[in-house]
Amino acid sequence: MRGIEGEQVLLRIILSESRTHDRAPLFRRLLELLRAEELAGATVLKGVAGFGHDRGIHTFMLEVTSEGLPIVLEVVDTQERIDRVLPKVDALMGDGGVVMTERAHVIRYAPSRPSITES
């Protein structure tokens, strides 16, 4: 495992859960890309509410299945690795969504405990 402690870059991608690429959720395609490019790791977060360029508020209600909720995909890695993957991310994103970077100070990067599997 390579260490990425210290000053790194946070890549944050915000998009609608309804976005697709080749009939698959776009966030899934982005996750597959980041894994294939061997970035340190990625996390996908689903928002409970948000609004975008259309100014309409999208929210999750138990009584109604909502579409277009915000998805946030976050990756922390070196500047070089983030810079290398950005053109590919941009190509997948097409129109819509937000892609941003910011500096991040990584205090700890360690593998999770082994998962407990049921027998």
Annotate each language-model stretch with its function.
Residues 1-119:
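Positively charged, small/polar-rich N-terminal and surface patches that mediate targeting and assembly
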